[in-house]
C-alpha cells in the first residue's frame, strides 16, 4: 500500500549527553527544534520530547510542539509511539501523530491521522522522519 507523504521533519533534540546514556536513567525529556517541509506546508517547529525506557530496551515516546507555518498560522502537533535502539547510537522511530491548526487554510491537517517513520541519531540528537497520512477522521467533516 502506497502511503501519502504529508511532510518531512528535521529536528534537533537538545541533548545534554549521549541519548544511550540518558535512557539508562529510565525517563528523559528535552526540548526540540526543527523544521517541516512539503509543497503544502513548510515551517519551524518548537516542542518537547519525552521518553520512558521499557524493560525490553525500547522507549515509549511522546512529543508535543508548535509548527509556525511560513506565511502565517500555528499548528499544534501531538505524537506518541516508540523508539528502538538499532546500532551505532541510532534509534528507529515509529509514532502516531495528530494536528490542530489555527487557520482555515491549514484545517485539512485537523482531520488527518498520521504515522511517523524515521530515526534519531543518539549521539547528535538529530531526528529525521517522514509523516504519512493514514486516515481521515470522519467526525471532523460533519
For the regions a protein language model found, what residue spans apply to each?
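Beta-strand-enriched cores of mature, soluble protein domains
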Residues: 1-142
Amino acid at each position: 500500500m502506497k502511503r501519502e507523504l504529508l511532510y518531512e521533519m528535521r529536528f534537533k533534540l537538545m541533548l545534554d549527553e549521549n541519548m544511550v546514556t540518558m535512557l539508562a536513567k529510565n525517563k528523559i525529556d528535552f526540548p526540540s527544534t526543527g523544521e517541516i517541509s512539503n509543497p503544502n506546508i513548510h515551517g519551524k517547529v518548537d516542542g518537547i520530547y519525552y521518553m520512558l525506557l521499557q524493560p525490553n530496551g525500547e522507549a515509549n515516546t511522546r512529543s508535543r510542539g508548535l509548527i509556525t507555518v511560513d506565511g502565517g498560522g500555528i499548528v499544534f502537533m501531538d505524537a506518541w509511539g516508540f523508539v528502538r535502539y538499532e546500532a551505532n547510537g541510532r534509534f528507529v522511530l515509529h509514532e502516531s501523530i495528530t494536528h490542530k491548526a489555527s487557520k482555515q487554510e491549514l484545517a485539512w491537517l485537523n482531520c488527518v491521522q498520521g504515522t511517523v517513520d524515521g530515526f534519531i541519531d543518539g549521539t547528535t540528537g538529530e531526528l529525521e522522519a517522514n509523516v504519512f497520512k493514514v486516515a481521515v477522521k470522519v467526525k471532523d467533516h460533519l
